[in-house]
């Protein structure tokens, strides 16, 4: 493979994704593995989790991935890699600052220099995360070093190939080379596969395209959507800082996000089958139907506005109780 050749455009076709070609045993094992990873991620939800999924950052990654004709999964993977790397860097800076504040004033410059370097290299790190994510999807297109360097130069950032490789290596080392973790898309596609085997009335391929659009929306409107969920869970329009911190585990629950995305997609595609889809999702994941309905309600409210399942089915208060219980249970485990 020529890593330095020009990157030719490739349109991502949602119909390329095929359902129903994997054995049920493989699906069961994969779903169990995803559920275990999700449970671990929810338990480890920390104070600053989600800080770098800010709308402008996500939009930058999405637009860059589109410009480079990358597959959808690369965009989500890049956002998650960047999120975890930047959090790790921020934690290291805070730890260094705490240690050096106890020392001499001259040593104080060290952590400040680290912070300045982090800010100055942010665009380079972001682009490196996209490039790393593209390498995980090696069956599509890998972004070449020349493509990255030309892009950075167009923005006014001059770097060498060596600096680009060092940036990738810094990210890999910081994350202990653990960058191939599941994104919300993996949960969505796995659940769609199971729905197909369970006889869901809405075809999985039909739901898949809508799920991709709604997943983009949730990433871009991450804060408003989860804020509305938080307000519903506590039945209060002004949550306290403590309540917000306890809700972090819900923000990191990719399985909950996936069922909400699928339920919202089902309502858009065929609202008459909405309740059936929610029932299937509940039996598959064990997540309360009220919680699934509330999440889909929040997504639909921020996407199509009116004509959501809210007026027809009074789910918000029931879902609020379910989400409140989930948040309380998660916080008690931390």
Swiss-Prot record:
Which GO terms of the cellular component aspect does the record hold? chromosome; cytoplasm; nucleus
Task: Please verify whether the record's keywords include Plastid.
Answer: no
Q: Cellular location of this protein?
A: Nucleus; Cytoplasm; Chromosome
Q: Which terms are listed as keywords in the entry?
A: Chromosome, Cytoplasm, Meiosis, Nucleus
The Gene Ontology biological process terms listed for this entry are: reciprocal meiotic recombination; regulation of meiotic cell cycle; spermatogenesis
Q: Null-mutant phenotype, please?
A: Homozygous knockout mice for CNTD1 are grossly similar to wild-type, surviving into adulthood and exhibiting appropriate mating behavior. Males are sterile with a decreased testis size. Females are also sterile.
| TM ranges | none
Name the InterPro entries on file. Answer: Cyclin-like_sf (IPR036915)
Could you tell me the superkingdom of the organism this chain comes from?
A: Eukaryota
User: Where does the entry say this protein is expressed, by tissue?
Assistant: Isoform 2 is expressed in spermatocyte.
Q: Which segments constitute the Cyclin N-terminal domain?
A: 29-180
**UniProt main location, coarse:** nucleus
Q: Provide the assembly information.
A: Interacts with PRR19; this interaction promotes crossover formation. Interacts with RFC3 and RFC4; these interactions facilitate crossover formation. Interacts with CDC34; this interaction regulates the cell-cycle progression.
Per its database record, what is this protein's job?
Plays a role in the different steps of crossover formation during meiotic recombination. Participates in the crossover differentiation step of crossover-specific recombination intermediates through its interaction with PRR19. In addition, stimulates crossover formation through the interactions with RFC3 and RFC4 and simultaneously regulates cell-cycle progression through interactions with CDC34 and subsequent ubiquitination of WEE1. May also participates in an active deselection process that destabilizes or removes excess pre-CO intermediates.
The entry's protein name is Cyclin N-terminal domain-containing protein 1
Q: Which gene holds the coding sequence for this protein? A: Cntd1
């Amino acid at each position: 493979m020529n890593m330095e050749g020009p990157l030719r455009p490739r349109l991502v076709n949602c119909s390329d994704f095929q359902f129903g070609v994997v054995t049920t045993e493989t699906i069961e094992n994969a779903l169990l593995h995803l559920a275990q990873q999700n449970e671990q991620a929810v338990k480890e939800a920390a104070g600053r989790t989600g800080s770098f999924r800010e709308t402008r950052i996500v939009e930058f990654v999405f637009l860059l991935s589109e410009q480079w004709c990358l597959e959808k999964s690369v965009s989500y993977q890049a956002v998650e890699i960047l999120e975890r790397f930047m959090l790790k860097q921020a934690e290291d800076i805070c730890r260094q600052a705490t240690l050096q504040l106890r020392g001499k004033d001259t040593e104080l410059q060290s952590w400040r220099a680290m912070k300045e370097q982090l800010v100055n290299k942010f665009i380079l790190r972001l682009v490196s995360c996209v490039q790393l994510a593209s390498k995980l999807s090696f069956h599509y297109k890998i972004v070449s070093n020349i493509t990255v360097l030309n892009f950075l130069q167009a923005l006014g950032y001059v770097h060498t190939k060596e600096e680009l490789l060092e940036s990738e290596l810094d990210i890999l080392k910081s994350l202990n080379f653990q960058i191939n973790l599941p994104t919300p898309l993996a949960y969505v596609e796995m659940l769609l596969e199971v729905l197909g085997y369970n006889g869901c009335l809405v075809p999985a391929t039909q739901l898949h395209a809508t799920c991709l659009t709604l997943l983009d929306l949730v990433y871009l409107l991450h804060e408003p959507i989860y804020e509305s969920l938080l307000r519903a869970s506590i039945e209060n329009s002004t949550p306290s800082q403590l309540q917000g911190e306890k809700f972090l585990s819900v923000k990191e629950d990719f399985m909950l996000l996936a069922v909400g995305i699928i339920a919202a997609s089902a309502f858009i595609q065929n609202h008459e089958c909405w309740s059936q889809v929610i029932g299937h999702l509940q039996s598959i994941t064990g997540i309360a139907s009220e919680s699934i309905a509330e999440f889909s309600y929040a997504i639909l409210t921020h996407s199509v506005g009116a004509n959501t399942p809210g007026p027809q089915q009074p789910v918000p208060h029931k879902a609020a109780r379910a989400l409140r219980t989930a948040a309380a249970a998660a916080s008690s485990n931390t």
